[in-house]
């Protein structure tokens, strides 16, 4: 059963104009980060491509520790505030959440993937419906119910 079957929804063949305009909406930041991984780092569609080292060089006044074992708030805020055009949703066919994903390494450069910091434990149907071509997702979660 695909993700659409899980949510009791049929896959739409084409996006209508109302869906392709605007920006994607997220209730869960960790889902947004997973989508950013796909669009920015895997498919190279979402620009600018965020790099914590370049960001730290441009914002020396923030004194960003690029060897951090904790969340770099300015980096997290960049992703939190990033608008993702709805037109890119059609390109998301799979999500592969992994502790080594670039999006996470740009938020916590020395993250070992062993805690629940980026776990995707909650997901709403309104969030997932934005991705009509999403067929497969490998997620990080601590919710095994």
Across the structure, where does each feature detected by a protein language model lie?
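A composition-biased, non-transmembrane "mature-region" signal
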Residues: 8, 16-17
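LRR N-terminal entry segment and analogous cap-like coil->beta motifs
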Residues: 17-144
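Short acidic, low-complexity intrinsically disordered linear motifs used
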Residues: 1-10
